[in-house]
Curated annotation (Swiss-Prot):
Residues 63-103 are annotated as: PQA. Residues 1-67, 160-250, 335-429, 477-507 are annotated as: Disordered. This is Transcription factor SOX-9. Residues 56-67, 160-174 have a biased composition (Basic and acidic residues). A motif (9aaTAD 1) lies at residues 275-284. Residues 30-41 have a biased composition (Low complexity). It comes from Rattus norvegicus. Transcription factor that plays a key role in chondrocytes differentiation and skeletal development. Specifically binds the 5'-ACAAAG-3' DNA motif present in enhancers and super-enhancers and promotes expression of genes important for chondrogenesis, including cartilage matrix protein-coding genes COL2A1, COL4A2, COL9A1, COL11A2 and ACAN, SOX5 and SOX6. Also binds to some promoter regions. Plays a central role in successive steps of chondrocyte differentiation. Residues 63-103 are annotated as: Dimerization (DIM). It is found in: Nucleus.
Amino acid sequence: MNLLDPFMKMTDEQEKGLSGAPSPTMSEDSAGSPCPSGSGSDTENTRPQENTFPKGEPDLKKESEEDKFPVCIREAVSQVLKGYDWTLVPMPVRVNGSSKNKPHVKRPMNAFMVWAQAARRKLADQYPHLHNAELSKTLGKLWRLLNESEKRPFVEEAERLRVQHKKDHPDYKYQPRRRKSVKNGQAEAEEATEQTHISPNAIFKALQADSPHSSSGMSEVHSPGEHSGQSQGPPTPPTTPKTDVQAGKVDLKREGRPLAEGGRQPPIDFRDVDIGELSSDVISNIETFDVNEFDQYLPPNGHPGVPATHGQVSYTGSYGISSTAPTPATAGHVWMSKQQAPPPPPQQPPQAPQAPQAPPQQQAPPQPQQAPQQQQAHTLTTLSSEPGQSQRTHIKTEQLSPSHYSEQQQHSPQQISYSPFNLPHYNPSYPTITRSQYDYTDHQNSGSYYSHAAGQGSGLYSTFTYMNPAQRPMYTPIADTSGVPSIPQTHSPQHWEQPVYTQLTRP
């Protein structure tokens, strides 16, 4: 009541200023005149006020309510108690109960609810433009200001309603309804999605840790190349965007690569994974390593210059490597040589003539290894044994090629050490690669690198799986060169597609 006094004074003054006639009624109402007259005077007085003083409406409401409520509230309560004109209280319970199979019985209204319901109706009629939320705030404030005598009628009505409610529902027990399953289901779904995303993200993070710039930047930058290289297990997580672009391919590659990934990280089962990993390494190495040369090769693939170049080149390199796939470690070394090749061109010169595919790394070993390649084309088994060793090297190399194989990238440091051209590894691996590459040439020439990669889930063809169709032209020549990686590839990265390579590959 005290809080409302200033409001009442203000409103009285405003009312006097606005309309002289209504002000006496207001004073009468506040004095305790019957509620209807008070309500009428309030309506007349406050509407002009509301229009004139929009900001003062809450105050007017409060004061008008204050004026009415001692009288009007009692009147409303008396109406409810006497005639049940105010039937909303019992009716909702009964209506709801009848409407539902298992009727939901509402709790009986307490004193404040009785007051709020009656007062809200009166106020809503008088001030239809008022917002319901504002009404609720005002009603709550007024209720706190009421004294015991003013609250008594509402308390009595609430008690009457409680007794009546107990009669109507003798077995009623308050059972608050709890919302079920929606939040839980959503949470479960979110958890599942989080888990789903966690594994790729974790892998991707691991890859990034292995090759921070190359795994994140290169895989993303080389979306075309990586798409082809998505089959590479590690690259796929880093290349989540790529996964979206080539979801199907990525899935196939992932299926082909799961073992490779598992083997890659702790074991050196790069026989299956090496080719793809080498492709990844090649791609990342190419980035750092022969972006210009790869740009030359990019046009055939139709990929944009640098990223395509990286993807293509790395695939080219990976072809060389994939041809070395039997000797994934060797391929890794070769790629490492590439990756390191830019720093050590002297080592590359022998390699450079050989392979545009794996320009520096593969090139140097392949020339001396041309004979060994053909000879050791039979040594695929040897390469298989070597791949373990060379695969370890490979893993390191893959680190050098951060984009595609995080695991390889992890191993890249070692491969870098091998980058000084582990010719011993290269020699056996290249001969192995020679036949592997020849096989790749067939697959690449077939023009379905992905299908071959999928079918050829074994490390060698998986590399081709990484190749993008756009990069196929390069790969086909590269495949040929990788078939004879040491000889034709070394001629020049530009000459990857030379028919000579194909011929060499065929032997």
